[in-house]
Every structure is written in C-alpha cells, then in structure tokens.
Amino acid sequence: MLKSDVIYLAMRQGGEEIDRVETTGPGTLDFLPNRTGQVKRNLKGDQIWITYGSGNRIDRFRSVNAVTRTEMQPPRITQSKEILAFFDANSVLTRLEQNTDFRYEEGDRRANARKATMEQATNLLTLDGAASTSDPSGKVNADKITLDQKTGSYTAEGNVSTTRQPSRKGGASSAMLSNDEIMQATARKMTSTDDNQKIHYEGDAKAWQGANRVSADSLDIDQSTHLMRAHGKVETQFFDKNTKTGPAISTTVRAADLEYSSDTRIAHYTGGVHLERPALVVDSKELRAYLKNSDSDSSLDKAFADGAVKLVSTTTEKGKGKRIRTGTSEHAEYLDRK
C-alpha cells in the first residue's frame, strides 16, 4: 500500500497492467503479510519509485533518505540514503540493499556501515565498509560484518577490533582473564556464536585487559565453559601489581598452544614453552602455570615445567655481583614465596 500527496502511475501497453509507480515527494509504503510467518514492514522515503512485473506484481522498488520498520519484538528499524528492494514472482521480498550511511536498531543492538544487504531466504544481514555492531556485551568494528538476524551470531572480517564488557558470570578472576576489566582484541577475522558466549579470533589475534595480554594465530574464548584456547605462536604477558617494594614484575610465556581455565586458574602451555621472569628463564616441552586471584599482588602462584627442562636463574649477591645458575631436568617447579 503506497501513500503520498501525489502519485504517478504508468500502465503497460494495452492498459491492463501497471508498468511503474512513483511519488513526486515523501511517501510511505506498507508491505502487509500474505502468508503465515511473514511480518508487516513499513518504509518512509523522500521519494519512491516502484517497478512492476507481469500480473501487476511488484518487481522492485527504490527510495531515497529511507527509514524502514519491521513489526516484530523488538521492532527492527533501519535507515539509509538509498534503498533498493527486490521481490520474487509472488511479490515476496527476497533482497534488500541499503546504501550510504546505513544504520540499524533492534532492541539494544545497534549497527552501522556504508552499505547493508539483507537476504530474506537466509536472514543474513551483511554490513560493508566501516562496519560496526554493538550491544550491552560490547562492540565490534570491521571492514565487513555478516549478522544472522535469527540467531544473533555474526562474523567480522578485515581489521577487526572488539571491546567486550567484563563477564560477571565467568570463573575465578586472574591476570589471564579478569572479571573486572574490559577486554579488547584485534584480529583479521572473528566469529561470535551462542549469544556471544563463544568467540573465535583468527589471523594475528591479540587480546588484552589493561597491561595483561595474549597473542596467537587464533584465539577462542568460551564463556559457557570458562575456557580460553590459543593456538600458533602463542605469547602471554601478565604483570604483578605495583607494590611498596618496587615496580610490577612481568611474566612472559611463549608456546605453540595454550589452554586456560578460569575455574582452576591453570594455564597449560604446550609445544616449545619458554617462560621469562626477572632473574628466571625456563624452557620446557610443557608448562602449567597456576595463577593467583586478580586481587593478589603477585600474578603467578607456581609453575610446573615438564620435558627437557632447561633453567637459568640469576641472583645478585652483595659485593659479588650477579651469579648465574643453570640446570637441566625432566621436571622443575617454581613457587612464589610472597
């Protein structure tokens, strides 16, 4: 149903079928459900052009400075400088393209991009060009974001950067994963599923909370199981808090793989592990680092190294300078004495 102050209608040869309809000024277009499961859609634009196919069915339409509203719970609202819509032989919407300054709102979810394409059959909304989406759990920026409007899952590609609010439902808080700090991350690609409970980063993935960080080829964070997994060129760095005795001490670990459980606060590194702390270097096949609560001054409680362990310890003795001790073993343990 089209409404406007002035509407022009052109008929096909013979005068029995509509060829096209257009408005000379602002108008509204209502799409009413004609089958079970469909929802009502409304469009408002500064001008509207409609092209018809055979049988007086809508083939496509175009509008400028358009706002759309889809009646669902909550309502879905979009706006853009231009909108193009395509329909099937039954006048059912199949594809919607919105160009230039696209904006999207559905409940507490927001999105924007230079261009958006909605495929009705798959319910996928693709945002292209300076794409961004946000909800109360955080925000995602990327060159391209593809959103499943039915499940809420999405994929972000190209120059991905994310900001996630602290999770109060996670496991124990530590330097590796804090329940009190915002987590930021970058990668070439990211996917989010299960209502943002499962996050996957790949391609030069980096995540950090304050000064504490982890980087790897790929990174997975599962809020439902309280697990974080990193694979390929893994490097973690976390800091003890500043104390009256001196500046913060950092612990850096490199490995091929990492699995961390916030329930146990155990970080399990495997594959050519290399640990560095001031005055201590440990190389091993695998290492289990037991982290303290994030409120503790020291981040590392203890660490167990296994397999071809090589240890270098440096101490400074008054009047004698530095003293270096080295050792090898199949097993070694580090215990924090604080």
Regions found by a protein language model. Give the residues of each.
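Mature-chain termini and adjacent capping regions
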Residues: 1-338
